Regions:
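Intrinsically disordered, low-complexity basic tails/linkers immediately adjacent to helix-turn-helix/homeobox/MYB/SANT
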Residues: 150-158
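Positively charged, polyanion-binding regions of nucleic-acid-associated proteins
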Residues: 86-108
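Short, charged amphipathic recognition helices of the HTH superfamily
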Residues: 102-123
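Long, low-complexity interaction regions most often at the N-terminus
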Residues: 1-78
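Short, basic alpha-helical nucleic acid-contact segments in DNA-binding proteins
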Residues: 136-151
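Short, basic interhelical loop/turn and adjoining N-cap
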Residues: 118-134
Length: 158
């Protein structure tokens, strides 16, 4: 089993561990059917001679696919590729978060705050506050379903 480390923001680490490792801290095994797995496989490269040891807060397990890239040789992500992976994880988290809150609010009748708290508990996210996620959801909701300003006519029936 070959592993490598990447640096991502703390709340994204918590999301990844909650999604793929059931909240257990340890090497992260991304399923091969995931888009994130394909992205990581496409971005992994040979370790340069000048590269130091891996540093980061997320340890990824690199699986051996039958074609091309042997993980014993291809086991390094440059800083630019780490940023691309971080952006992809952030996009995945936000999409799942918005879908989760919409589903729980409209289908199960939960309030937005309760649905957000449930999302945080399910994925073990503690480095973000609920207010941050509430504000993010409000921005998303206003962008997707903007409110129309209602114009009232003044009525002088007296």
């Amino acid at each position: 089993m070959v592993t490598t480390r990447i640096q991502v923001k703390e709340y994204l680490k918590e999301y990844l561990l909650g999604k793929y490792n059931d909240g257990v801290d340890g090497p992260l095994r991304i399923p091969p059917s995931s888009d994130l797995y394909e992205l990581c496989y496409n971005l992994v490269g040979k370790r340069p001679v000048s590269a130091g040891p891996d540093s980061g807060n997320v340890e990824l397990v690199l699986r051996n696919r039958t074609s091309c890239k042997d993980p014993r040789v291809y086991n390094w992500f440059c800083p630019r590729h780490q940023l691309l992976i971080e952006r992809k994880v952030k996009l995945m988290m936000r999409a799942e978060f918005h879908d989760f809150v919409d589903l729980h609010h409209h289908r199960y009748g939960m309030t937005y705050v309760d649905a957000i708290a449930e999302f945080m508990n399910r994925f073990g996210i503690v480095s973000l506050s609920e207010e941050t996620l509430v504000k993010d959801y409000q921005r998303y909701r206003n962008r997707v379903r903007p409110h129309e300003k209602r114009y009232y006519k003044k009525c002088n029936d007296k």
